[in-house]
């Protein structure tokens, strides 16, 4: 009497089986209580024993026939034979012992019924060797329970014969007392047994015939094999033996165990705990033809370990240059040279058109960020372990790095201060974009250590990245190629003109290595601007398209005319140069990367002289003013492919009040150093195709602490080059408080070129 899952309980179908069980158990119990005691004394003690054994056998077979699986075939899935359900023929013929047997398609179970299988309309299942559905046992009679049903009929018939026979003996011996209770109950049991004896004996005889002939009730009723040969018969004895002694057929449908549903309820507003080591999430990205597999490990514990990291780690190890990859471009330089800081870092282009043509380059070490008021000392540079590196890749925009590229530098950044004005609000927006740009590079995270200047107050802003903090991956022009590291000697990140240089050593050199010039302790500064020679960014043109180079060539003539105008301006101002407004990030390190003769440094005056100086808001040199206007307008058209926090410094540079700055002096030891090798040029586009940007010879003054206001500063409007401020893009030297500069000034020409889509590039000559 197994019930298929999902069917409703129908109480009416249990009425026949409940009646049969009640009559069987009730009548037999009355017989054993009221009749068997006298039969035991008068006839034989074997009478109740015999009837008891037969009764137990009847109950056992009845239970097996009722609760046993008759051989139900499992239904096919909805989509398993969906096509066959519409196109399959209704019948198929198979050979059984050389006889064609027809199989019918079952539209309910979605398969062809095996031979002798039929679908039960009551149970709604296809049953193997289906005989019939018996309501007295409330179950189908099939291959697996037919044996117990047949034995139930035989034992029940024998039990009924015994009850009627021994009851008749008791009544005949108590004929004078028919009104007695024992005689009345015995006569009632005899009537019930005799009433059901006729159909039971008839049904038993019918199944005896079917068993001996090897047929089922369904085959007999439907007329199968009538007048023909039954392919399933085994002979009379063989059929009886097969029914009574054959092994039990396997069960095809196994009901799942009904276990109590354990549901763990958690109170609301509580987030589930994250695993400390979650499995990496593989993300397949498709953008601009580039597909990269990224492994992101998101876990709460990895973020917690970042804060728990000790702050006593040493500086990062020198880079390991991979030989054999673009050997013409990656020449292994000597340590300490300018090429050693540049050859191992390449930049991926920010324009989508260049993503398809990026070769893989080896990576270099990552140098920590410095913000205003914050500086990373050399020997105490802090790096995190690899276990925390890969766990910090919580990025809102996944990077598009190549799959074979190792972990890049994801730079630690601090949230900006609350905006106090419109300029601060604009700088905060730029800083948030810079966070996204810097977080696209997964890898080494560097902790920061704040540093305050000795004589200046802490600055109110924070910056995002330092000149040599971003990793480069190929040789195209992009946001990061303008941020290549400067001299191996290393410089302090200028948080403000008032912040001085603390003894920072480059991660590429040992703190005590040869060639590291001595650095005196910072002295008190005077409120003047120090020398700020400009240096071009070492960029590569290997991956530039022909369209960009054609645009470069088209603008060559116009830029040559502008250079002539700027040369006239240089003759007017002598040793003055064209610079941006003094900001914290316009003072960058790059002097060792330049080419050309040295020139004396410029000494800057106060902000009032800068504004009132020639070429800035005055009519002393209209030609220079026109060239500066056209230059700033072309620069300002650069798309914001990536943002930085330099606009915050521009806001501070425009604020009224005196500007503390580093002195315009050098130590005698630094003045006599030879010029290091120049920036390597691209083998593809070097020579006549390179053009120049304004950069005049700057006379270097002798060491002095006097404030000179002779030469005003030329100021260009704040603009962005390839998504960054020009001060950061040109990598000027980092200036600290009065004292020796980190690197001598060198003359270099830089060309600003507009590419496809308005992108502006700087090309060094």
Swiss-Prot record:
Residues 35-52, 170-190 are lumenal. InterPro entries: Palmitoyltrfase_DHHC (IPR001594). The active site is at 134 (s-palmitoyl cysteine intermediate). Residues 104-154 form the DHHC domain. The modification Phosphoserine is found at residues 337, 606, 627, 675, 682, 725, 743. PROSITE patterns: DHHC. GO terms for biological process: high-density lipoprotein particle assembly; locomotory behavior; peptidyl-L-cysteine S-palmitoylation; positive regulation by host of viral process; positive regulation of cholesterol efflux; positive regulation of protein localization to plasma membrane; protein palmitoylation; regulation of postsynapse assembly. The modification Omega-N-methylarginine is found at residue 441. GO terms for cellular component: cytosol; glutamatergic synapse; Golgi apparatus; Golgi membrane; mitochondrial membrane; postsynapse. It comes from the Eukaryota. According to initial studies, defects in ZDHHC8 may contribute to susceptibility to schizophrenia. However, additional studies could not confirm this. PANTHER family: ANKYRIN REPEAT AND LEM DOMAIN-CONTAINING PROTEIN 2, PALMITOYLTRANSFERASE ZDHHC8. This is Palmitoyltransferase ZDHHC8. The gene is ZDHHC8.
């Amino acid at each position: 009497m197994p019930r298929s899952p999902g069917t409703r309980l129908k109480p009416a179908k249990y009425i026949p089986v409940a009646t049969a069980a009640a009559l069987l158990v009730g009548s037999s119990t009355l017989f054993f209580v009221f009749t068997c005691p006298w039969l035991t004394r008068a006839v034989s003690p074997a009478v109740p024993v015999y009837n008891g054994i037969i009764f137990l056998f009847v109950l056992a077979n009845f239970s097996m026939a009722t609760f046993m699986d008759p051989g139900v075939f499992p239904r096919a899935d909805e989509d398993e034979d969906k096509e066959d359900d519409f196109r399959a023929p209704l019948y198929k013929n198979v050979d059984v012992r050389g006889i064609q047997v027809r199989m019918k398609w079952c539209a309910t179970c979605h398969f062809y019924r095996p031979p002798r299988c039929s679908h039960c309309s009551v149970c709604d299942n296809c049953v193997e060797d289906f005989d019939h559905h018996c309501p007295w046992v409330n179950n189908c009679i099939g291959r697996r329970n037919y044996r117990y049903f047949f034995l139930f009929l035989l034992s029940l018939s024998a039990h009924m014969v015994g009850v009627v026979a021994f009851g008749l003996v008791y009544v005949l011996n108590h004929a004078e007392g028919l009104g007695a209770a024992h005689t009345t109950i015995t006569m009632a049991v005899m009537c019930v047994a005799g009433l059901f004896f006729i159909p039971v004996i008839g049904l038993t005889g019918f199944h005896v015939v079917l068993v001996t002939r090897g047929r089922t009730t369904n085959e007999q009723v439907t007329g199968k094999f009538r007048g023909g040969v039954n392919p399933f018969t085994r002979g009379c004895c063989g059929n009886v033996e097969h029914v009574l002694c054959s092994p039990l057929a396997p069960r095809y449908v196994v009901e799942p165990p009904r276990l109590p549903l354990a549901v763990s309820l958690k109170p609301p507003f509580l987030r589930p705990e994250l695993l400390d080591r979650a499995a990496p999430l593989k993300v397949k990205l498709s953008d601009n033809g580039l597909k990269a597999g990224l492994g992101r490990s998101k876990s709460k514990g990895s973020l917690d370990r970042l804060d728990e990291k000790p702050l006593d780690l040493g500086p990062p190890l020198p880079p390991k240059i991979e030989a054999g990859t673009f050997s013409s471009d990656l020449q292994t330089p000597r340590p300490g040279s300018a090429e050693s800081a540049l050859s191992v870092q390449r930049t991926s282009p920010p324009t989508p058109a260049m993503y398809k043509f990026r070769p893989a380059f080896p990576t270099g070490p990552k140098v920590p960020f410095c913000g205003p008021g914050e500086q990373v000392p050399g020997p105490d540079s802090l790096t995190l372990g690899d276990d925390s590196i890969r766990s910090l890749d919580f990025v809102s925009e996944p990077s598009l790095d190549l799959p074979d590229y190792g972990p890049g530098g994801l730079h630690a950044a601090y949230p900006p201060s609350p905006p106090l004005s419109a300029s601060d609000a604009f700088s905060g927006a730029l800083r948030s974009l810079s966070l996204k740009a810097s977080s696209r590079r997964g890898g080494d995270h560097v902790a920061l250590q704040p540093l305050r200047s000795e004589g200046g107050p802490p600055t109110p802003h924070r910056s995002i990245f330092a000149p040599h903090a971003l990793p480069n991956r190929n040789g195209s022009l992009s946001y990061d190629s303008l941020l290549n590291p400067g001299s191996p000697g290393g410089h302090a990140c200028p948080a403000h003109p008032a912040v001085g240089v603390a003894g920072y050593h480059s991660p590429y050199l040992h703190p005590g290595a040869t060639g590291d010039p001595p650095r005196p302790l910072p002295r008190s500064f005077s409120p003047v601007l120090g020398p700020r020679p400009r240096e071009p960014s070492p960029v590569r043109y290997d991956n530039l398209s022909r369209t960009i180079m054609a645009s470069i060539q088209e603008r060559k003539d116009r830029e040559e005319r502008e250079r002539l105008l700027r040369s006239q301006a240089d003759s007017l101002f002598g040793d003055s140069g064209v610079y941006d407004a003094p900001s914290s990030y316009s003072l960058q390190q790059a002097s060792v990367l330049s080419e050309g003769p040295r020139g004396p440094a410029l000494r800057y005056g106060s902000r009032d002289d800068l504004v009132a100086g020639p070429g800035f808001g005055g009519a002393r040199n209209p030609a220079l003013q026109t060239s500066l206007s056209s230059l700033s307008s072309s620069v300002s058209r650069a798309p914001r492919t990536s943002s930085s926090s330099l606009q915050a410094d521009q806001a501070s540079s425009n604020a009224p009040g005196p500007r503390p700055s580093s002195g315009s002096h050098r130590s005698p030891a630094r003045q006599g150093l030879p010029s290091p090798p120049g920036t390597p040029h691209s083998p593809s586009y070097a020579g006549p195709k390179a053009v120049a940007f304004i950069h005049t010879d700057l006379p270097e003054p002798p060491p002095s602490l006097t404030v000179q206001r002779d030469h005003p500063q030329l100021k260009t409007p704040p603009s962005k080059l390839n998504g960054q401020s020009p001060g950061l893009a040109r990598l000027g030297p980092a200036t600290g408080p009065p004292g020796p500069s980190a690197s001598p000034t060198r003359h270099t020409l830089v060309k600003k070129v507009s590419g496809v889509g308005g992108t502006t590039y700087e090309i060094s000559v």
